[in-house]
Curated annotation (Swiss-Prot):
Belongs to the universal ribosomal protein uL18 family. Pfam families: Ribosomal_L18p. This is Large ribosomal subunit protein uL18. NCBIfam families: L18_bact. Gene3D superfamilies: 3.30.420.100. Part of the 50S ribosomal subunit; part of the 5S rRNA/L5/L18/L25 subcomplex. Contacts the 5S and 23S rRNAs. Keywords: Ribonucleoprotein, Ribosomal protein, RNA-binding, rRNA-binding.
Amino acid sequence: MSQVDKAARRQKIKDRSRVSVQGTASKPRLCIYRSLAEMYAQLIDDVNGKTLVTASTMTKNNKAFEGTKSDASRIVGQQIAEKALAAGITNVVFDRNGFRYHGRVKALADGAREAGLIF
């Protein structure tokens, strides 16, 4: 499967899932993005169009992490959960953004659940 086909497939899945996955202020959308090297997570309120909380492997304390990308993704999940709980958010809607629920995506979700987010 060519790279163009993979990108088009992911975009179709992303568009299809966005219909049913909507975030509100009380239950925001946990949106993730996975690049080849990094992992990003955001809590988004779609009603007001605001990003409430962010976490990624690009932060200073995560840049020095030496381990696997899956371990780094788990830490990002724990960090987003800690920031969300500090902001008074416990329930979220998980948006995998067209990525398969496997590997780093699953590790981030598991880390967020371990730290106290409910989804």
